[in-house]
């Protein structure tokens, strides 16, 4: 298994697919990396030479923010929004949708599992 940016890439996958295992690299960026390094996208990770792996590592480290650095930056951006007290920051803090989606129904992904309120039974009249 090849290791790039702290992620083990599976040997049997094509390079463009394997690169998407790295946080911060999607399909289009994986293709772009292959083109700029001159390594064919269809080549399997197990078939890569050590020189090609070093080229990939160096190119990704120099040109892109991936894995831990990217996660840290995203978390800092969210923290900055919360500290400012702006609308988006408040929505993040409350665990509600940030981009204007409705919340009267749905929004379950952001809100989490429903919390049932108990003890609301009415007493029987005699």
UniProtKB/Swiss-Prot annotation:
InterPro entries: Rbsml_uS13_C, Ribosomal_uS13, Ribosomal_uS13-like_H2TH, Ribosomal_uS13_bac-type, Ribosomal_uS13_CS. Gene3D superfamilies: 1.10.8.50, 30s ribosomal protein s13, domain 2. GO terms for biological process: translation. Keywords: Ribonucleoprotein, Ribosomal protein, RNA-binding, rRNA-binding, tRNA-binding. Belongs to the universal ribosomal protein uS13 family. Part of the 30S ribosomal subunit. Forms a loose heterodimer with protein S19. Forms two bridges to the 50S subunit in the 70S ribosome. This is Small ribosomal subunit protein uS13. It comes from Aquifex aeolicus (strain VF5). The gene is rpsM.
